[in-house]
Swiss-Prot record:
Subcellular location: Cell inner membrane
Reaction(s) catalysed by this chain's protein: 2 Na(+)(in) + 3 H(+)(out) = 2 Na(+)(out) + 3 H(+)(in)
Name of the protein in its database record: Na(+)/H(+) antiporter NhaB
Transmembrane segments: 13-33, 34-54, 90-110, 121-141, 145-165, 205-225, 241-261, 306-326, 351-371, 393-413, 455-475, 481-501
Origin: domain of life: Bacteria
Pfam families: NhaB (PF06450)
Role description: Na(+)/H(+) antiporter that extrudes sodium in exchange for external protons.
Record key words, sorted: Antiport, Cell inner membrane, Cell membrane, Ion transport, Membrane, Sodium, Sodium transport, Transmembrane, Transmembrane helix, Transport
């Protein structure tokens, strides 16, 4: 049946996305300029933020790059922000972009080692609760020294490997190397229930690991990009940063691990799914088969990948180079010493991260609108105007948390620390209050932001990864599964800010672990970030 040219244009627009979704995006594109020019640029700015969140929430209907990109292009075209401001945002976040381009590809070339290690862990630990705690704790520990995105890239890589192994067998193609694990049409009805249970099992492990990256990432100055910016503004070194955060991070970490145990035991919010016995048998058979067929060439590859893993951890922990450049070194070393020298063999490694890199560039265009239209200014001004110091600390934590749920936590943390730094330099607040506020900003941007994928880049990467549709992990499901953690982390963090922060900081001063800061010790350079 032939189709008219007009209908062909409509059908091609956003491809297989539902018609209602296409109409919604077109409506946004019509409404935004009208609101910007005839109502109020501030309102139009917030409208754009809400619309962009909508495209993220519908990630399984349509990858957010296309609809979000159209909204961003229009925003620049009508003057909500400028190409220069977008470029400034991209330059300021070049390390994150390099990380996505190179580090995620680097992890791809270490798949064999990761599957080897994690298969042993998955088969070795029979208790789902113990396994969940192991994933959460390991992710937290690694995120304290590495980047959360790198940790999530590792976990995603492992989960895709596990999923593909079972899916191949469930589809009756156990020996096939070219099996398509994204297609369920060959899955036997008897194994379909196991497949659903297995998906739920993998979803819960991924969410535990995702929250683990937030629990660990808040603790050290290298854990998250905004931590580095905050530490730089306050003039804190690695050890001092950890100690200053302890009144909040220690109780939050303990309660986070307890939450991990509780949700698994109670089976709430999508947790509690156990590894089906049939799947365990398949993974055990796979492991035995791999062990039997492993040659010296395979062993040599595993040894090389192990040595590269050591370099990766040492390089990142000591910050020997930008994360992305260390990732590039991993690609070069892993391919050179394992014999991957064809261009098409290398291309697959970049497939996972490049669409997300493009999406992040669009995200920074939205951040540019937030800056140019001063969308957060009323909130920041209101919090800074509060006289009571204790209330100001709590409000900073809450305001940071709420804004980090809708925007990038790096951006929110940077904006706030720069505003507080300006207040310190103008004599509006004391150095002691500045130090306490810096802790409130750091914990506020890192902890409550687990509520939605917008706040944590690692969560956003997980949501838009090739793995998410395989295990049916949608935006709504992520928010629902993160809910127990969001409540516990946000409330315990708030409790720590109100009751523990001031007395414990004073105690650390008395013990001589840290010294009270002076205005001179805070670096005067406003971060190059924003």
């Amino acid at each position: 049946m032939s189709i008219s040219l007009g209908n062909a244009f409509i059908k091609n627009f956003l491809g297989k996305a539902p018609d209602w979704y296409k109409i919604a995006i077109l409506s946004f594109l019509v409404i935004n300029p009208l609101v910007f020019f005839f109502v109020d640029p501030f309102t139009a700015g917030w409208l754009l933020v809400v619309e962009f969140i909508f495209t993220l929430a519908m990630a399984l209907k349509c990858y957010p790059l296309q609809p979000g990109g159209l909204l961003a292009i229009e925003a620049i075209a009508i003057g909500m922000t400028s190409p220069e401001q977008v470029k400034h945002e991209l330059v300021a976040n070049i390390e994150v972009l390099l990380l996505l381009v190179f580090m995620v590809a680097g992890i791809y070339f270490m798949k064999q080692l990761l599957l080897f290690i994690f298969t042993k862990i998955l088969i070795g630990i029979k208790s789902k609760t113990a396994l969940s705690v192991a994933f959460c704790f390991t992710a937290a520990f690694l995120s304290a020294f590495l980047d959360a995105l790198t940790v999530i890239a590792v976990v995603i890589s492992v989960a895709v490997g596990f999923y593909a192994i079972y899916h191949r067998v469930a589809s009756g193609q156990g020996g096939s190397q070219t099996h398509d694990h994204t297609c369920d049409s060959d899955v036997d009805e008897l194994t379909r229930e196991d497949l659903e249970d297995y998906r739920a099992f993998l979803r819960s492990l991924l969410m535990h690991a995702g929250v683990g990256t937030a629990l660990g990432g808040v603790m050290t100055m290298v854990g998250e990009p905004q931590n580095l910016i905050i530490a730089d503004q306050a003039g804190w070194m690695f050890g001092e940063f950890i100690i200053r955060m302890l009144p909040i991070t220690a109780p939050v970490f303990i309660c986070g691990i307890l939450t991990c145990i509780a949700v698994e035991k109670l089976g709430i919010c999508g947790y509690g799914a156990k590894l089906p016995e049939n799947v365990r048998k398949i993974l055990e058979d796979y492991e035995a088969e791999e062990r039997k067929n492993r040659t010296n060439i395979d062993n040599a590859k595993l040894i090389i990948q192990g040595l590269i893993a050591v370099w990766l951890i040492v390089g990142l922990a000591l910050h020997l180079a930008a994360v992305g450049l260390i990732g590039l070194s991993v690609i070069i070393l892993a391919t050179a010493f394992t014999g991957v020298i064809e261009e098409h063999s290398m291309g697959k490694a970049f497939e996972e991260a490049l669409p997300f890199t493009a999406l992040l560039a669009v995200f920074f265009a939205v951040v540019a609108v937030i800056i140019d239209q001063e969308l957060f200014k009323p909130i920041i001004d209101a919090v800074l105007a509060v006289e009571d110091k204790g209330a100001q600390l709590a409000l900073f934590y809450v305001a940071n948390g709420l804004l980090s749920m809708v925007s990038d936590n790096v951006f929110v943390g940077t904006v706030y620390i720069n505003e507080v730094k300006a207040a310190l330099m103008d004599g509006v607040i004391t150095r002691d209050q500045f130090d306490l506020l810096a802790v409130a900003i750091n914990t506020g941007t890192n902890l409550p932001s687990v509520a939605t994928p917008n706040g944590q880049a690692a969560f956003l990467f997980l949501l838009t990864s090739a793995l998410a549709p395989l295990i049916q992990l949608s935006y709504g499901r992520m928010v629902w599964m993160a809910l127990p953690y969001t409540i516990v982390l946000a409330l315990v963090g708030m409790f720590g800010i109100i009751f523990f922060l001031e007395p414990m900081t004073a105690m650390f001063y008395d013990l001589g672990w840290i010294a009270p800061g002076t205005i001179e010790s805070a670096t005067s350079a406003i971060s190059s970030g924003h």
